[in-house]
Amino acid sequence: MRLEVSRHCPARPTLRGRVFRACAAVAGGSLLVIALSGTSGARVFGPPGAAGPPHYVSLGDSYTAAPLVPNQTGSPAGCLRSTHSYPFLVAAGTGAATFTDVSCQGATTANMTHPQSVPLGTNPPQDNALSAATTLVTLQVSGNNIGFSDIIIHCTTLSLTNPFGSPCKDHYTSGGTDKLRAKINAAAPKVAADLQGIHADAPNAQVFLVGYPVILPNSGNGCWPLVPIAFGDVPYLRGVEKALNSMLAVVAAANHATFVDTYTASIGHDVCRAPGTKWVEGLIPTSLAAPFHPNQLGEQGMARRVLTALG
């Protein structure tokens, strides 16, 4: 999918009456003003490096694609991309000259260089979207390398057996080895290889590796049964997510990419918060988003972090 992003964009209503507005600010639209409700005001962003608006390519998994967040777009439809995902907001906020979003739900590091089968089609290798003309790349990947969906299924199911214990932690650390930490370690060289491939395919691009926002509360033992993760498993899974983000930060620094920390800004917006505050939905979403995935507020929050990183 290749989209040309207009430099003159009207206000667009979002969930719960919030408004995203992007419109050309100065000559030729080379700078753009973006105002997101809930921020301190409009911010001005220039192009990320080379003169003129960026040629932007978005790579990633479901946290990038924003499944079920309105409006779903693109091909193959099974990738579940939203027009309100953070890449779309970043494209508007930078006044991107061209914008290509090839993110896809379920993507792993392997799908940067290998096709991905999804319902209703196949997503080509995501790196195919890159070229020497590309000047901005965002990548968000590795959650599926550690088995994000399986973790959710196991941990929510096991919470019913011992809601005040740590059945999920016990499952993943049985035998004396933390299987999730091992998967994080195994993913590190694969993320590094993806970044190296991006630099090879898009030698003129600034590359940003985007981390994952808070899912479970940053302190305490969660909110079972509202979100069915056992009390003792919340600190464990919180540590797993922090370890994943730490790995991404280290790999980014070692491979000429800028790490975008979305975790810190999302503290206080976890799945246990009320609708209108939480950035990530729980097992039973209260707004249009996939379970345990960012809603529209979460995508806006991640967009702000990426735009801030662009400087």
What are these regions (language model features)?
Residues G106-P124, V271-T286:
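Charged, often glycine-rich, active-site loop that binds/positions anionic groups
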Residues G41-H55, G121-T138, V191-Q206, L307:
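Short amphipathic alpha-helices and their capping/turn segments at secondary-structure boundaries
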Residues L136-V137, N162-D201, F208-V251, N255-F259:
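Conserved N-terminal glycine/acidic-rich loop preference
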Residues M1-V44:
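Secretory targeting and sorting signals
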Residues H55-G60, T64-A66, T98-S103, T135-Q140, ...:
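Structural recognition of the beta-strand scaffold that forms the well-ordered cores
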Residues P67, L120-K183, V214:
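Oxyanion-hole/transition-state-stabilizing segment in secreted/luminal serine hydrolases
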Residues V44-G106, N128, T156-N162:
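Serine-esterase "nucleophile elbow" of acetyl-processing enzymes
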Residues P213-G311:
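Catalytic His-Asp segment of secreted/periplasmic serine-dependent ester chemistry enzymes
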